[in-house]
């Protein structure tokens, strides 16, 4: 049976992650409060930010910036967007 969580991002019961994505308290918090859908959406957005803003994951400041944006993304706050990006029309 699929484990469900009350997703912090989408404010509804959705399938949860299979395991914490990070070690420690941060990973456990994501595991308990973020759905698979929200995590997949974050990974797409994270990739866009890394590419468009040319972030270097070897740089501690860039990792800290990205983690801050992840927190905003999941909390429903305003988060950084790639300049000039227009989502595809459905």
Swiss-Prot record:
Pfam families from the UniProt entry: Iron_traffic
Keyword Iron appears in the UniProt entry: yes
One Gene Ontology MF term: iron ion binding
Gene3D superfamilies: Fe(II) trafficking protein YggX
Gene Ontology cellular-component annotations: cytosol
InterPro entries registered for this protein in UniProt: Fe_traffick_prot_YggX, Fe_traffick_prot_YggX_sf
Superkingdom field: Bacteria
Keywords in alphabetical order: Iron
GO terms of biological process kind: cellular response to oxidative stress
Function: Could be a mediator in iron transactions between iron acquisition and iron-requiring processes, such as synthesis and/or repair of Fe-S clusters in biosynthetic enzymes.
Family: Belongs to the Fe(2+)-trafficking protein family.
The name this protein goes by in its record: Probable Fe(2+)-trafficking protein
Organism: Pseudomonas putida (strain W619)
């Amino acid at each position: 049976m699929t484990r469900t969580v009350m997703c912090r991002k989408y404010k509804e019961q959705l399938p949860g992650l299979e395991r914490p994505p990070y070690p420690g308290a941060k990973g456990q918090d994501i595991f308990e409060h973020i759905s698979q859908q929200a995590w997949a959406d974050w990974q797409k957005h994270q990739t866009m930010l890394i590419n468009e803003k040319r972030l270097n994951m070897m740089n501690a400041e860039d990792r800290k910036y990205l983690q801050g944006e992840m927190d905003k993304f999941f909390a429903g706050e305003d988060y950084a967007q790639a300049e000039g990006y227009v989502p595809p029309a459905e």
